Amino acid sequence: SEMCIRDRLVTVLLGILIFIDDYFNCLTVGSVMRPVTDKHNVSRAKLAYLIDATAAPICIIAPISSWAAAVTGFVEGEDGFEIFIKAIPYNYYALFTIAAMILIVALNVDFGSMAVHEANAAKGDLYTTPDRPYANATEDVIKGRGRVLDLLFPIITLIVCCIIGMLYSGDFFKGVGFVDAFSGSDASVGLMLGSFFALIITIVFYAVRRVLSFNESCSCIPEGFKAMVPAILILTFAWTLKAMTDSLGAKEFVAGLVKGVSGGWLSILPAVIFLVAVFLAFATGTSWGTFGILIPIVVSTFSGTNHTMMIISISACMAGAVCGDHCSPISDTTIMASAGAQCNHMNHVSTQLPYVIVVAVISCVTYVIAGFVQNPIIPLIIGLSLIHI
């Protein structure tokens, strides 16, 4: 129905708006949109897909995000933030996932097991399978005074504060130009400062509005820290893996192999890197760990030789990591999307997989083309055309 399409589009829009962090995205979009989509008979599996498809794919192409900070931290000997920006047009999996999701929602089409879930939801069964996680749970109502502003204000404040924080870390307030300050910023420092001040402002805002008292707001902080512990551990282990591969000389070994490869075979390297990243992220369930292993190898392989090919290959690594993470049943983001939608986890994985495979195949084809043309536009147009077909 028209109401269902509108609800899905609002879910997508909210997911795109919350690009700072994928955990924050999954939990916020899920808790906000779940009562609305339930009311208009959107299956929990479809909601989980919409949440998951606007989490990592949005964060990996957003310069102001925890993912950008993680990626730039793995790029050594180069301007990590500048490379991240240049890699965005080549991040085909993320771009095609967002495009495919919008097309699916706008045209109201589904295929595979998702079509079964949506057909059952139209009859009032939002779960399809007997397992109904949180079926008897009641939605937490914190205060009756809550308004739309209470949701939008913290998000907008967080984005603005993070931008200011990144400009500050890039010495913008010491006379450096806007673009130079942004490209020369330390994303991790900027996000940390921005998040801290956004938290303070939000606590004061809620206290003034009498939505949450100071004590109630402060009691939420430990819960927030707990939610981020898995991400902190993943990043720590990713850095450990990076140090181990560095010690083993993996970068030099791969660089030596690639230098012996002739031009034609070199052009398909981005597609190979994409596939390796997909399988590595799928097996480990972590895209950040995949970044930590592959990005330093890619940088050392192409550094000082073919800068464009390095950017395409780094982007292929990021896209493949997100793709593998997207369909892995042990991925933290996939688990968070299931939790946000309160959907059976394996239902979410099985219904999302056909969509992921279609976009992954198209992305792999576009990386083969990108390796030869070394231009982001032509493969992008071809990929979008294939999605539309």
Listing of model-derived features with the role each one plays in the protein:
Residues E2-I5, I389:
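Short, small-residue-biased leader/transition segments that mark boundaries at the very start
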